[in-house]
A protein has these predicted regions:
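Structural preference for beta-rich elements and adjacent junctions enriched in aromatics
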Residues: 20-303
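Bacterial Sec-dependent N-terminal signal peptides
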Residues: 1-26
Length: 303
């Protein structure tokens, strides 16, 4: 009887602990709006166009780690604009001690998620609460992008077409992103998408997001997404991305130090990615160099 009672206590304690690190997605998702712009947005990280001052602010960033549910220790103000070509994302990330608060491991694209300060946005174009395109940057404008499926499957090999610039001051670092609509996937007549905004404050080992996401899950658990409305993207259409490559092989044969034969081979090839519709992509590879080819990636369509 004593043993049964002990096990009951353990189970109750485990359930209590689990309840502290997870919670259900809200029945009414957070709602935010984007501002349509007609002026040219210069992607320089300064956020000094008039449209940025007029756009609604997003400031309710909540800790995921280390203290779930607590306000962020350093404030973040994000805003979203759009026009017929781009979705623009801007953010002002406050710091306590200026540049000394920032941690950046390297300047390589697709940098480490955990070892760098970063700001990012996940976009669920179909509102299926499963799939998302993630765009991130560190304080020095290095890009990182991921495809996320079900909050558990990650394609880190994906490279989307987008641009970003950042600025660092004594009290902030600012982000200005321009994401082409033809990089994103969404249905015809789209007027809203799902988003999760994130920031890693590495000096405090702190990760914050809007909306809040339980620490038991990856931060890109899209059932917790906010709804971004007020958008009028162009109809989704086909676009083509070409990734060429060239390999040069030079062979020399010498006998007793004398060159007797020299041969140079040039090999050309590449990959063509053709987005034929809002939820279909065709990949073509020609003259593949299998020594350089990626292994098969796990992926999924949005529907």
């Amino acid at each position: 009887m004593k043993r049964i009672f002990t096990w009951l206590l353990i189970i109750l304690f485990a359930n209590y602990c689990l309840a502290q690190i997870t919670f259900e997605p809200p029945t009414e998702p957070a709602k935010i709006r984007a501002l349509k712009v007609s002026q040219t947005i210069n992607i320089d990280g300064k956020l000094d166009e008039a449209s940025w001052f007029s756009a609604p602010s997003i400031t309710e960033f909540i800790q995921k780690d280390p203290t779930q549910g607590a306000p962020a220790s350093m404030s973040t103000e994000a805003k979203i604009l759009y026009d017929g070509d781009y979705l623009y994302v801007g953010a002002v990330c406050k710091t306590t001690n200026g540049k000394s608060d920032l941690r950046t491991q390297n300047m390589q694209r697709d940098f480490s998620y955990f070892q760098n300060d970063l700001f990012g946005i996940a976009i669920d174009g179909f509102l299926d609460k499963r799939n998302a395109m993630v765009f991130q940057t560190n304080p020095y404008g290095t890009q990182r992008e991921i495809l996320v499926m079900d909050g558990e499957i990650f394609n880190r090999e994906w490279s989307g077409l987008w641009s970003v610039r950042t600025q660092i001051s004594d009290s902030t670092w600012t982000v200005e992103m321009a994401i082409p609509w033809n990089t994103l996937r969404y249905p015809p007549a789209c007027d809203k998408i799902g988003v999760i905004l994130t920031r890693n404050i590495r000096s405090n080992n702190e990760f914050v997001s809007f909306p809040a996401v339980p620490r038991a899950f990856n931060v890109y658990r899209m059932p917790y997404e906010a709804i971004l409305s007020g958008i009028e993207p162009p109809p989704p259409g086909a676009n083509v991305q070409v990734i060429p490559y060239a390999l040069v092989n030079n062979e020399r044969v010498s006998v007793d130090g004398d060159l007797t034969e020299e041969k140079t081979d040039l090999k050309l090839g590449g990959e063509v990615k053709w987005v034929t519709g809002p939820n279909s992509v065709l990949d073509f590879t020609f003259n593949t160099d299998f020594a350089q080819a990626d292994v098969d990636r796990q992926g999924g369509l949005s529907k």
